[in-house]
């Protein structure tokens, strides 16, 4: 039988009786004593808070002492310039001062954290947010970012954009266009970097897997596109560009822009957001939508984007890649050639720019893509650009034009070297363990490999009929049976097979291309992509060459300018100075004048001219020096 005392619970009075202080001896405090007790507690808590604040301040001062004095002066002056919206000073400090201090003190380590420099700038949160944007950009460029850096950079840039977009009115901030472009370009770069890093779960630690599972929306495609489209909508940039293209006055354009779009900060952010949308849509594999976002952006030589070389090169590179994805090879060639000519002319002004390295790499990738496009769509192009292409990729270009299995490998290598690093839209399901295991067991194909397969399928369709094109160049008209007998494959082919190859060649040799009157990037008309066209009448093939004549005017102008510069250089160069005779040489002996019969001395006979020094064998004299001596 169970013991009933096992479930006995003592009464409350019995428990209180066991306390050390009897309940009847307790005397409640008076109101005055209670007030004094609360006051003492408040004073004690305040003293503790003060001590902690002083301790933190001492720690901050100790850390601030480790920061170089020139860095502290720079941060104070930078903060003051931003408060005063002093645009020239901000531009100088951003483009020059920041990079010089980075080279001097923080080439291989981080800048001080924002919390450490907060006392120097009066804890200004707007400036600290801008400083963090530069801080994380430096981490991505010089160091290896950790997962905390990736998360914090996303939170900081979202905080900055929320401040710009969700304020009650336009924020009183003025930043240089170079900084605004770099900010948005870095935003897209960090998004692509995080997407590639997130797409490989096998290389993640347990802590990283947990953080990715808890934050599936960090650096998501939706959040990035939402920010860019919000900036476009807030600035009314498309409406402004349409009004400017329609020839409306400045007042009318300002009225269309509205309260936010009329401010340079929002207008420039909206304009650069269109270019970043082009970039993102190309990476996500939607070239049509990428070109649609640029329908109101002018790509001429006087366009706003040409003010920033990095923006100019990036825009044309992704427009050309979008055209390649659509199979519009002539438009891609025109786009690449246009920006490469600009880069060659402006190269001397950007060799010392901190962005010159990345710009040069992008141009090098465009040379490789140009080698691909000119092979798939042969035709006249700029000679200077094609000379550089042959210098850089001469061996690959010969293989591409020769055709065969080697050409397919060369196409593959050049494409992987120069194409954008495409992104997978759907990241691994880190938040679902079972789904992640299934994903690891059967991972999806890489986005770049999918685009490579599509590209190679187009190449194979064209390369399979290259021999047929070479045969057609020899005739103006030829029968299909005779063409089958001359087949380069070495196999006997009937008329039907030859006609099928001709139809494939006809289809592969035509595409859409922009004309002179086209306004948007997607508009175009049907064009022949090479210098050969033909028609089929029954079994007879009529061939017509469409090679355009070379324009000699530009050739003569360039060479005349080069000759004029050479002549000016020769005329401005100093003439050679003949060395004086050495003082140690003996003086020439003087002979006495002969005495005439009349007693007067006769005039001395004229001295013979010294013989010209013999020219040593093998001595080379520059032509420019010969010209100066002759002059």
UniProtKB/Swiss-Prot annotation:
Highest taxon in the source lineage: Eukaryota
Subcellular location: Cytoplasm
UniProt GO cellular component terms: eukaryotic 43S preinitiation complex; eukaryotic 48S preinitiation complex; eukaryotic translation initiation factor 3 complex
Region Disordered, residue ranges: 571-631
PCI domain segment(s): 335-526
Compositional bias of kind Low complexity: 580-612
GO BP terms, alphabetized: formation of cytoplasmic translation initiation complex
GO terms of molecular function: translation initiation factor activity
Record's keyword terms, sorted: Cytoplasm, Initiation factor, Protein biosynthesis
Family matches, as InterPro entries: eIF3l, PCI_dom
Disulfide bonds: none
KW Cell division (keyword) present: no
Pfam family, one: Paf67
Subunit structure as annotated in this protein's UniProt entry: Component of the eukaryotic translation initiation factor 3 (eIF-3) complex.
Biological role stated in the UniProt entry: Component of the eukaryotic translation initiation factor 3 (eIF-3) complex, which is involved in protein synthesis of a specialized repertoire of mRNAs and, together with other initiation factors, stimulates binding of mRNA and methionyl-tRNAi to the 40S ribosome. The eIF-3 complex specifically targets and initiates translation of a subset of mRNAs involved in cell proliferation.
Protein family per UniProt: Belongs to the eIF-3 subunit L family.
Listed name of the protein: Eukaryotic translation initiation factor 3 subunit L
């Amino acid at each position: 039988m169970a013991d009933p005392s096992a479930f006995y619970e003592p009464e409350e009075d019995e428990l209180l009786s066991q306390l050390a202080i009897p309940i009847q001896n307790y005397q409640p405090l008076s109101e005055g004593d209670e007030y004094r007790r609360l006051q003492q507690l408040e004073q004690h808590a305040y003293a503790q808070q003060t001590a902690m604040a002083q301790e933190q301040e001492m720690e901050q001062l100790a850390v601030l002492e480790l920061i170089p004095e020139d860095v502290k002066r720079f941060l104070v002056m930078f903060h003051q310039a931003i408060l005063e919206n002093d645009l020239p000073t901000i531009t100088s400090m951003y483009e020059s001062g920041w990079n010089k201090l980075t080279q001097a003190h923080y080439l291989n380590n981080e800048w001080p954290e924002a919390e450490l420099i907060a006392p120097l700038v009066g804890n200004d949160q707007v400036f600290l947010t801008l400083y963090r944007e530069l801080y994380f950009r430096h981490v991505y460029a010089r160091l290896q970012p950790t997962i905390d850096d990736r998360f914090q950079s996303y939170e900081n840039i979202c905080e900055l954009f929320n401040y710009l977009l969700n304020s009650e009115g336009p924020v009183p901030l003025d930043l240089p266009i170079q900084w605004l472009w770099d900010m948005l370009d870095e935003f897209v770069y960090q998004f692509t970097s995080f997407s590639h890093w997130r797409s490989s779960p096998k290389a993640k630690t347990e802590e990283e897997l947990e953080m990715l599972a808890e934050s599936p929306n960090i650096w998501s495609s939706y959040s990035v596109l939402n920010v860019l489209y919000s900036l476009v909508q807030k600035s009314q940039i498309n409406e402004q560009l349409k009004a400017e293209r329609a020839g409306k006055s400045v007042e009318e354009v300002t009225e269309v822009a509205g309260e936010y779009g009329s401010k340079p900060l929002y207008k420039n952010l909206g304009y650069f957001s269109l270019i970043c949308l082009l970039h993102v849509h190309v990476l996500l594999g939607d070239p049509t939508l990428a070109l649609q976002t640029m329908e109101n952006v002018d790509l001429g030589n006087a366009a706003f984007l040409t003010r920033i070389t990095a923006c100019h090169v990036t825009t044309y590179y992704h427009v050309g890649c979008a055209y390649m994805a659509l199979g519009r090879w002539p438009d891609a060639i025109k786009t690449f050639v246009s920006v490469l000519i600009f880069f060659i002319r402006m190269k001397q002004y950007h060799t010392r720019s901190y962005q010159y390295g990345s710009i040069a790499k992008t141009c090098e990738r465009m040379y490789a893509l140009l080698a691909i496009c000119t092979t798939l769509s042969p035709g006249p192009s700029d000679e200077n650009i094609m000379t550089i292409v042959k210098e850089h990729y001469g061996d690959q270009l010969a293989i591409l034009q020769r055709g065969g299995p080697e050409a397919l490998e060369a196409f593959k290598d050049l494409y992987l070297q120069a194409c954008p690093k495409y992104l997978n839209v759907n990241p691994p399901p880190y938040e679902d363990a079972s789904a992640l295991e299934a994903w690891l067991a059967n991972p999806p194909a890489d986005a770049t490999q999918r685009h490579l397969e599509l590209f190679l399928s187009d190449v194979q369709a064209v390369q399979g009929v290259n021999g047929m094109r070479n045969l057609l160049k020899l005739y103006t008209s030829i029968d299909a049976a005779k063409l089958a007998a001359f087949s380069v494959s070495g196999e006997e082919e009937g008329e039907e097979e030859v006609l099928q190859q001709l139809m494939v060649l006809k289809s592969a040799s035509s595409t859409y291309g922009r004309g002179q009157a086209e306004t948007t990037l997607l508009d175009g008309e049907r064009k022949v992509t090479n210098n050969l066209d033909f028609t089929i009448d029954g079994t007879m093939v009529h061939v017509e060459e469409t090679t355009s004549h070379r324009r000699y005017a530009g050739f003569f102008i360039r060479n005349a300018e080069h000759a004029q510069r050479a002549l000016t250089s020769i005329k401005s160069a100093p003439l050679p100075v003949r060395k004086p005779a050495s003082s140690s040489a003996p003086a020439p002996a003087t002979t006495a004048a002969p005495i005439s019969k009349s007693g007067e001395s006769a005039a001395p006979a004229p001295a013979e001219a010294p013989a010209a020094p013999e020219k040593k064998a093998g001595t080379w004299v520059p032509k420019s020096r010969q010209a100066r001596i002759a002059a």
